[in-house]
Amino acid sequence: AMDYATPAEQIIQASPRHRARKLMTTMSEKGFSHIPVREEGAIRGVFSISSVFDYVRRYPDRGLTEDTRVADFAEFLPVENHGERFLFAGPELTYWEAREAFGQVYKHRRLAVIFLTEDGSKTGRLLGMLTPWDVLGLDEEITAEEMVQPAQ
């Protein structure tokens, strides 16, 4: 699965002190929907569209100012508090295991991201990140390539 993952050095990562609106602008410009929030080397949570939505819904009077930090979303960042699911796996995860994981729905929650870490835990060193598009989108690409191959 590592062959299909976005390598850690190419993943936008945040810390609790990052400005939320600036991060949201970057996410929008780059087309990212989930940003790992790291502190002391470990993934402490995920900043996402649903984090922002939950924050605004819970605290409608606070708004999002230039001074709003990722830390202000603290209660909505832990992977356990998301409406989506996140999986942590080691580098030995295969493409087919990742594909199967993305195809499953658990308690009405879809798998949004697989974080590949050195030891398969959220405290392990981040190696890469897989999204459903990284894995499930390959079938369409392969089919499209096969369709344009000249007949033998």
Model-predicted regions and their roles:
Residues Q10-Q13, A42, F88, R125:
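Short, flexible active-site loop motifs that bind/organize anionic cofactors or intermediates
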Residues A5-A8, A14-R17, R21:
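The feature marks the first
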Residues A1-Q10, S48-L111, T131-Q152:
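Tandem CBS (Bateman) regulatory domains
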Residues M27, I35-V52, F102, Y106, ...:
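A glycine-centered beta-loop-beta connector
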Residues R19-K22, T26, E97-A101:
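Well-ordered alpha-helical segments embedded in enzymatic catalytic cores
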Residues Q13, K22-T68:
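Acidic (E/D-rich), amphipathic helical modules within compact regulatory domains
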